[in-house]
Amino acid sequence: MPDRSTKTTMGTEDMHERKVSVEPQDSHQDAQPRGMFHNIKFFVLCHSLLQLTQLMISGYLKSSISTVEKRFGLSSQISGLLAAFNEVGNVSLILFVSYFGSRVHRPRMIGYGALLVATAGLLMALPHFISEPYRYDHSSSDNRSLDFEASLCLPTTMAPASALSNGSCSSHTETKHLTMVGIMFAAQTLLGIGGVPIQPFGISYIDDFAHHSNSPLYIGILFGITTMGPGLAYGLGSLMLRLYVDIDRMPEGGINLTPKDPRWVGAWWLGFLISSGLVVLASSPYFFFPREMPKEKHEFHFRRKVLASAASTASKGEDLSSQHEPLKKQAGLAQIAPDLTLVQFVKVFPRVLLRNLRHPIFLLVVLSQVCTSSMVAGMATFLPKFLERQFSITASFANMLLGCLTIPLVIVGIMMGGVLVKRLHLSPVQCSALCLLGSLLCLLFSVPLFFIGCSTHQIAGITQDLGAQPGPSLFPGCSEPCSCQSDDFNPVCDTSAYVEYTTPCHAGCTGRVVQEALGKSQVFYTNCSCVAGNGTVPAGSCESACSRLVLPFIVLFSLGAGLASITHTPSFMLILRGVKKEDKTLAVGMQFMLLRVLAWMPSPVIHGSAIDTTCVHWALTCGRRAVCRYYDHDLLRNRFIGLQFFFKSGSLVCFTLVLAILRQQSREASTRTTVKSSELQQL
């Protein structure tokens, strides 16, 4: 904050400018216009782009979560923890940032935070560059081989040594794996720390220096542009996952994989590099914005205000004080306690937190938002993977569905909620009724989702129900002479019986041919003793017979998500109108902190753990459980949609209680008013 002499100088210069402005010539400000870095509109543009790119980089991991699992052998529980770990860094520092408010150079702090976010994105991509090339077939000992040897049925005496032992495992291998995972967790923590100052400092800066009538418009534009970030993240993920993971170090001659192959791993790391570059570009203007800029004057009333200020000395003094009033505002939580030290602030905060938590409306609305946010966090993290596994579609197509349908409908829902609150001037009771209606409709749209999906197809030796005909086991008699690796994964499909084998070896195949058709190569395995007919099977998993159901599923799911998002603005208004005026700033800060701690941190882990319980076949790496290769689709659908249904039901119950309490308070207030009126009439 400027000292007294600085304020006096600023006031003298401002009064001089006002005196000059009444002359026939143009004002001094018009004669010497300030640069674009002293224009709050340019700051709004820059901040919109920065928050857009920040959400791109934070949302990109969710778009490639299943790919990262396959590449580094992670369970869904661990990947969910990884996706939620950026909230750890965010929550650990949010109180300190809220305390400091405008006591620091906010634009520069935003710039430094953005550079940390970009650094975190680069760290997320680092494991790709320090790890060995991806091996999609364990039967080859040469990591850089163009065409990995097929895992064929070979007699034990002819099998290579690598096929009979897990010789690639060592303490060095496990240490390297832990290092890769540790780097990604550190990057996610840094991502959360870097994002701490960006939104609160940006909003407070806009509110301080924008005209009071323009501030809501600017913040609305900011959020409108920002909400496109997750959609762009899923779109970027859709594009990047079509490229092979080792596109920068492809073996000569290419690979024999397509994106439909379950072993396919896309270029997950490339999206982090692109997003990081965009964040760096968006952060560069912040180092040129001033700590404080002149208060924006309303465009249509500027000259009238200038003439009025010149007509009266008293008016000058009032205008001058109003001109500098925003400079005295403290952004964040320090606004209500500017004289407290940091230690005193930390001591006061728990008492204010408990006071607000004892407020029934605040508590119930926050709990409903926790339920909704838990649903959204689980959806954003694992819905692409769910679609990929449930309907046997590619990761790229799953991301495209979310980015093109689900995210836009959520944005429309948020906008509709805001428009309804503004246009209809909804009271707290009406806001709670709107929230209740949105939650109820969202819940109803979720019911059909339990019945739309694909059952697990027959997998030899893994699924128990193989139909009327007895199916082969993992080591049937037809493949007993073969030396098959139990941890190898190179699926083939017997299209005549619609049975999938984990490797050609388990199907008893001894030969392999590659056929060229329409510019594409197709791999076939021949002389398969476990396959009827000509004994030939194509490489790859069996195609799902109900993949077309993904469209009605995602439409219903997206409509439900859009209806749930209608509650965003009215529930926020319930908090603002339901707490004491002096607690509003703290209430909003506590709301976001509680949502992070109770929803955005645990929900991805909860959803990931639920998904892991539906796995029927795990890949093993050095004796430890790694990525899941096959799920029980019916169980996966029931548990994933069931979790979503549970959180939606919790939100509905909370909003029902809020509406009941507000109606009771309204009736009591009406009764008191009637009694007072009767007493006055009697007097």
From Swiss-Prot:
Subcellular location: Cell membrane; Basal cell membrane; Apical cell membrane
UniProt membrane topology term: Multi-pass membrane protein
Residues glycosylated per entry: N143, N166, N527, N534
GO biological process, one term: intracellular iron ion homeostasis
Topology feature Extracellular, residues: 62-80, 133-177, 248-265, 378-397, 450-553, 612-644
PROSITE patterns, per database record: KAZAL_2
The UniProt record lists the keyword Transport: yes
Parts of the chain on the Cytoplasmic side: 1-41, 102-107, 208-226, 291-355, 422-425, 577-585, 663-683
Effect of disrupting the coding gene: Knockout mice show no difference in growth rate, viability, fertility, progeny, life span, weight, organs, tissues and serum biochemistry. Knockout females exhibit an increased in Cyp2c65 and Cyp2c66 gene expression, but not males. Knockout mice exhibit a decreased plasma concentration of certain drugs administered orally such as fexofenadine and fluvastatin, whereas no difference were observed after intravenous administration. Also exhibit a decreased in the hepatic uptake of drugs erlotinib and mebrofenin after intravenous injection.
Covalent S-S links between cysteines: C478-C509, C484-C505, C493-C530
Comment on protein domains: A conserved histidine residue in the third transmembrane domain (His-128) might play an essential role in the pH sensitivity of SLCO2B1/OATP2B1-mediated substrate transport. Transmembrane domain 1 (TM1) may be localized within the substrate binding pocket.
Note: Most likely contributes to the absorption and the disposition of a wide range of drugs in the intestine and the liver.
PANTHER family: ORGANIC ANION TRANSPORTER, SOLUTE CARRIER ORGANIC ANION TRANSPORTER FAMILY MEMBER 2B1
Protein name: Solute carrier organic anion transporter family member 2B1
Gene assigned in the entry: Slco2b1
